[in-house]
Amino acid sequence: LFSAHYYGLGYYMHGLQSQPAALTPAQEKCEKFMTLVAENFKTQREIGFYADKLCVTGKYLSTMLKQETGMTALDWIERHVVLYAKSCLSSTSMTIQEISDELDFPSQSVFGKYFKRVEGMSPKAYRQSLSKD
């Protein structure tokens, strides 16, 4: 499941690599952003962190990503965080608290609310849904 996490990134990157011309500045920024997210999503969920690293504003970063990929910066960050959490929930015996700690959330409650907002169900409900399949 966690490999699905990179499907969107891989699909986008394949599109960039198959283009004969050099990358546009926006495409280069997208590539750098995705690399930064893959390296930092466990501890950095703020758009400002990534925008600062890329020397752009958060608004510009999100607009550029939306134009290039169809997803905003926050969408990409949340996708990485939640897909990693789903992978842990489905393929490890880690507790929800341990996953919350691994992803640097201030509490299990905050993690649960984040997961539910993005995924539409709590981490516990997600794990239980896996055992029904």
Question: What role is predicted for each listed range?
Answer:
Residues 10-35, 39-53, 67-75, 79:
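Short, Lys/Arg-enriched, Trp-marked, Pro/Gly-tolerant hinge/linker segments that flank
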Residues 48, 59, 95-98, 108-109, ...:
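Residues within helix-turn-helix
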Residues 61-62, 110-111, 115:
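Short hydrophobic/aromatic patch on the recognition helix
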Residues 113-133:
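…primarily DNA-binding HTH/wHTH and HhH modules…
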